[in-house]
Each structure stands twice: as C-alpha cells, then as structure tokens.
C-alpha cells in the first residue's frame, strides 16, 4: 500500500468510522430494509465508496 494510504488509515478513529457508518446508513435507508441481504450488500458497497471519498478529501487537504 502507498505511504499516503497508510498515513490516512492512522487518522481513522472509531469515531470517524462511526460517522462514516452513520452517513452510509442514512444514504441507503430509503432503498433497503435493514437486516436484509440487500441492505448488507448496499451498506458494504456504500461504506467502501464513502471511505474512498474520505481518503480523497484527506489527500486534497494534504496537498494544501
């Protein structure tokens, strides 16, 4: 993995991951019933997207 990603991972606290989880849950709540397989798949997919977006924001901040 890149040095940048390793540095980003160190910034992820339980609180920041919980915030990403909560944001993700709100994003998919209207589309899938919680507890279903579809919810789990959507949650995992959207969490991955949200973490990548957080990484991109972090990279942009590091360049400033």
What are the roles of these predicted feature ranges?
Residues 1-35:
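N-terminal acidic leader/helix
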């Amino acid at each position: 993995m890149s040095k940048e990603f390793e540095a980003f991972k160190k910034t992820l606290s339980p609180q920041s991951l919980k915030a990403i989880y909560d944001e993700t849950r709100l994003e998919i709540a209207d589309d899938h019933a919680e507890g279903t397989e579809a919810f789990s798949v959507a949650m995992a997919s959207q969490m991955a997207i949200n973490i990548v977006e957080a990484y991109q924001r972090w990279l942009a901040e590091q360049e400033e």
